[in-house]
Amino acid sequence: MSPTMLTYINEESDVLANIIRRHRQSLEDVSRFASQKTLRRILILATGSSLNAAFCARYFFELCGISIDIKEPYTFSQYENSDPQADMVIAISQSGKSASTLEAMRKVQAQGRPVFALTADPQSPLGKASDYPLDILTGIESVGFVTRGFSATVLNLLLIALLIARQQQRLTESQAEEYVAQLQRIAATLPLVIVRTEAFIHQHQAVLRNGTRFVATGYGALVGVAKELETKFTETVRVPSSGFELEAYMHGPYLEANAEHVMFFFEDRPDARSRALREYMTPAVAKTFTLTLAKAAQDDQTLALDVAVDHHFSPLLLIVPVQLMEFHIASLKGIDLSVRIFDDFDRVLKSKI
């Protein structure tokens, strides 16, 4: 039987645990690079889900004393100058076939600067052309809508930040080990997250099936989760979907709300600003949901996962409900995700190699 998105989501716990277990070996080039020069500024080149993964991880880099500049590859290649102050460059493409990311990487290399490629396929065009290919240790997903690979990309970025901070003594060994232990607990908790989310989706399936517009908000690291909902809901559920930074939503986008919209509010712990916005928007839309790591559910429209972790690691948990909703809402709407559409798109537009 061919794997589905659900197959890969259910594998995430084991896959993430394996990445954590092997990260010192798989990311050895990062540690070696960090031992040779001080790393204060990193340029990340990414688009699509890879860009969203970078948004999820960026503030942990900042916590580790590393400024992050995230660029869309095409815009970077065509219109921007490469920052000479960047100490390290990472190009991200799960397939390793993104034409724009490859072009952006070559622009950096033409200036005599090495590039790390974070990919599920080190033998891909991006992996082969890079100076340091980094395997995210998931293999290639045969389903076009990656889930396991997204979570693995976020985790690998967090581990890269951790290795640099460790190598350059910005974290003590005990601090670093506590972060690793948290990541291990997250991986072990994912099966329970899946069980709770499945029950939540079943409870609200009528609302989710009938949704004609989905909007998500998040803050900090959870902006990446909201943006990934935008990307993947658009691909799978195939109705207009958007993800916003919490405060940005309050500066105009709220004006489009109507009685057919479904809204999701992501939080790692009870957040007064997010909950005030949800309370205000509830009368104006079809339904509002809170997805939180808090212990107690606010109401039956709240999925409370009851997991206490550092804010910077919360995307690894809260992305799982998004991934499960992608699969189940598509199914509820009668969309067969195994049937490819626009099959000649990459060939005609040359967006993938």
State where each predicted segment sits.
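Glycine-rich phosphate-binding loops that contact phosphosugars or nucleotide phosphates
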Residues: F33-R185, Y219, Y254, V262-V307
